[in-house]
Structures are given as C-alpha cells and as structure tokens.
C-alpha cells in the first residue's frame, strides 16, 4: 500500500514540475480549511500533515530546512520544500547515523557521521523522497519536494492557512507519511479573496523498509547504538 500511495503522490507532484506555468503577478488569495485525520482503526489522530497546492511554479527561497537526528528519530519526520532548496541533517545523538534515500527524485547516501556533524543535500527535482538511517531501522522521514512555496504544515487541530496563492483553479493536496491513500480537491482562488476547503485523510501503520543495499536490516542492529 505504501508504494501505491507514494507513486500517486509522486505523480501528483512531478506532473506539474515541468509543465506548470509561473505564478501570476496579480495579488494572490488565501486558502483556509481543516484536514480531518483518522487512523485506519477509526480513531481520530493528531496532525502531522502537509497541505500544498500544485499547478504553478515558483523560485525557491534561500532557507534550508532541517531534519534533526535525535533519540534515534528524525525530527520532524515530514517536511516540505520547494524545488532546488536544501535540507540539513544534524546529528544530535552520541552515536553514528547514516542518512540515505533510494527514492527516484533524489537518491543519495550521506555516509556515517557522528554527533555534532551536519550534512546537507539539495533537491533539484519535484517528488516524494523517503529518508532512512542505514544503522537504525526505526528511523524514517519524508521530504516533499514541491514546485512552489504554497505549502504548510497543518496545526495540531488540522487547521491550515495558505497565503498568497495565485488566482486560478488549482489542485490542493493533504499528505501524511502513513496515509492509506492520498487526498485532494479542486480549489478556485480569486485575487484578494479567501477560499475554504476541507480535506480528510486516513493513516495506517508505519511500513517496513530495506536498508541502503536493498536488504533487510540485521536483527542485531542494536550493536550500533
């Protein structure tokens, strides 16, 4: 199921990467709403959802996103950036980590590095990039590389606000790492206006993954702690 979800999200992002028009110069509008998040067992869930709009391109900002390595976790485990922006991976743990990805938009292997060291990676292509640690199988994160800067992290209550959206009809998406399927809707934005749209998403369990060699993690990975 994870492969299907990732493929659908990747197609949604990548399909606009080279064909989308530049953002319009006229004043943008505001898109607000709520994402209802439910676990697969029907229980309500906290946020940790990225909401984004596709259909147009914007240049990247100068900012560098950060995914920290703390307590054998990636923090945060979901970030959104614009094409050609960078992500920094600082290690705050007193042991080695090895950050890598086998995702088609950006395959990379940062190698092993110790506490106090930070490595960066740029992301020149749109898509969904799943990131793991080759030493600790419990570590997983996702980077959404998007064609524009109209993206945001929904609040703990699922509410979101997207400012400066160009006038027009666009697709709006809600993405969660453990979603059983992607969710999207059409949204029409008017210059200087506000549009409300609500979305719903269902999440499942964290899927298993392979190490950077395409193999299962060894049972004795605790020796690397």
Where do the PLM segments sit?
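Bacterial N-terminal signal peptides that target proteins for export
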Residues: 1-9
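Extracytoplasmic copper-binding redox domains, predominantly the cupredoxin/blue-copper superfamily
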Residues: 24-225
């Amino acid at each position: 199921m994870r492969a299907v979800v990732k493929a659908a999200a990747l197609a949604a992002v990548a399909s606009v990467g080279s064909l989308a028009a530049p953002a319009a110069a006229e004043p943008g509008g505001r898109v607000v709403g709520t994402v209802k998040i439910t676990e697969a067992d029907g229980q309500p869930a906290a946020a940790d959802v990225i909401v984004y709009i596709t259909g147009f391109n914007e240049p990247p900002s100068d900012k560098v996103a950060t995914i920290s390595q703390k307590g054998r976790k990636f923090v945060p485990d979901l970030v959104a950036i614009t094409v050609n922006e960078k992500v920094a991976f600082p290690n705050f743990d007193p042991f080695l980590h090895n950050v890598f990805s086998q995702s088609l938009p950006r395959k990379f292997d940062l190698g092993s590095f110790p506490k106090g060291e930070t490595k960066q990676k740029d992301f020149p292509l749109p898509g969904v990039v799943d990131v793991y640690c080759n030493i600790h199988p419990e570590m997983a994160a996702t980077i959404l590389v998007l064609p524009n800067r109209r993206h945001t992290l929904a609040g703990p209550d699922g509410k979101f606000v997207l400012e400066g959206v160009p006038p027009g009809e666009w697709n709006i998406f809600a993405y969660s790492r453990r979603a059983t399927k992607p969710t999207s809707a059409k949204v029409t934005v008017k210059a200087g206006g506000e549009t409300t749209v609500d979305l719903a998403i269902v999440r499942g369990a964290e899927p298993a993954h392979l190490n950077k060699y395409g193999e299962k993690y060894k049972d004795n990975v605790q020796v690397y702690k």
